[in-house]
Amino acid sequence: MNNFKRPAGLSLLLLAAVSLQSQSSMSGGNLVFYGLAALALLIFFYIVVSVADNFMVIESKQMGLDDENRAGLFPDFRQMFASKKPGYLKEAHVYTLTKGYDIPMDGEPQETIRDAKVTRFAISPPDFFGLRPIPKLLVEEGDVVKAGDPVFFDKQLSRIKFAAPVSGEVISVTRGLKRSISEIVILADKEQESRSYELPAAGASREELVEFLLESGAWPCIRQRPYNLVANPDVVPRDIFVSTFDTSPVGPNLNLTVRGRMDVFQAGVNVLRRLTPGLVYLGLDGRGESDSPFAAVSGAEKRYFRGAHPAGNVGVQIHHIHPCGVGENTVWTLGVEEVLLLGELFQHGRYDTTRLVAISGGSFSDPSYVRTRAGANIGELIAGQTLEPNSRIISGDVLSGIQKSEEGFLGFFDNQVTAIPEGNEAEVFGWLLPLKPRASISPTIPVLSDNIHITTNSHGEKRAFVVNNDYEQVMPMDIYLTQLMKSIIVNDLESMEGLGIYELVPEDVALAEFACVSKQPLQQILRQGHDTMIAQG
């Protein structure tokens, strides 16, 4: 009997152990289930709150409320751990842009300034977008002109006259395809003489100011958005925008441009205030330790921008301050040099296109600044520089400038001449592994220096339009650039309008073109889209 009880007891103990083990297994399974359910609930809750947070941020930006701080449910940890802002920004309107890219390029101009001895200048109709290729000439070879004398006008808008940048003799009228006019070249006088003006009265109306600017030849320095056209004098702009700093690769320091001329710049801003019922906005550089000299300007709304290129583009600033559009949302833009031109005209009664030009890029022996006038001959402008053999000269910056020869001329709106080596040398196994330092937004190619000797090599050829997020990494604008470009290619007007074509000009997409893995000519595509929209009225 006892022998029977012993195995029976063992059996009961085993059964109890198995039962306990199964209960513990069920309990463990329940814990896993409840844990997964709780995790799923937390993820769902986070998604809902994140979507609500994003909607709040988007709506606050549309309402113009998100000037400095992030108006959402969550704090912006990038701002929390970012470097401390300088004291001058504490009470200012500041836009911190987290997207963009500063190309690490050598050839930054040193702050030394010399007077360029240039004898030939030109005004080029192609510098003014929207102008008919064959404008009506008012001069011919051999004519003598003063600075400010009209040399041609647009047949479509005959009230807008384009003036000679210097006084001297017209020595050539260069024509291009289909008899289009490429350049009107002037041999400058040693002693410059400006056309005399009868300035409007201090209390002149807006209409009188507009007529004076049209007659003086200064009107073409005002550009209109959308499309970056020469401003239409029959349109009253909602606002006027001026960017006072340049973030393009090895670009000029515009603080040097106004050194000793702040009174002239202030006079120009005073004129702009009388041309719009809205506001004059100045985009200021908020990246430095000390405040911008433009902060002292009165009569204008000041907005600071911090971030990588293209933070200095006026189009990016318009997008964040008050986006432009057609009709009542038309705005005007000017550069610092153009504001100075207006200031000289109204303060001293002379047409003066004097500007500082940055001679920059790794191909120049001594990157620096030269003082000259608009349309200067590039060969004379860079005289004294040793140019690296097999280099490309660009009027403007490397992203949106135009290739020129030494016989070419500085663009009317350009304040920079860049030279970099041609990238026409084969790189051994370049398709497999970059053996030389190169600029790239990709983290797979580490950039170990801020002074890379960049060439024109694009490291690839045009290929199928690949969809990725490269554009979004460098575009600090709420615009779907890939979809916009594709809508332009297929000529979908409604999609082009809805996707933001009115807010962009070629310089705004130049950095995206640099980052494009498909090597698409985005600036050219955008300009084609502008042509289509203008043709459709």
Regions found by a protein language model. Give the residues of each.
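N-terminal secretory/membrane targeting signals
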Residues: 1-23
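Buried, small/hydrophobic-residue-enriched core segments of structured protein domains
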Residues: 23-70, 160, 174-537
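Short, solvent-exposed loop/turn positions at domain surfaces
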Residues: 133, 139, 156-159, 366
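Short, well-structured beta-strand-loop connectors
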Residues: 139-153, 171-172
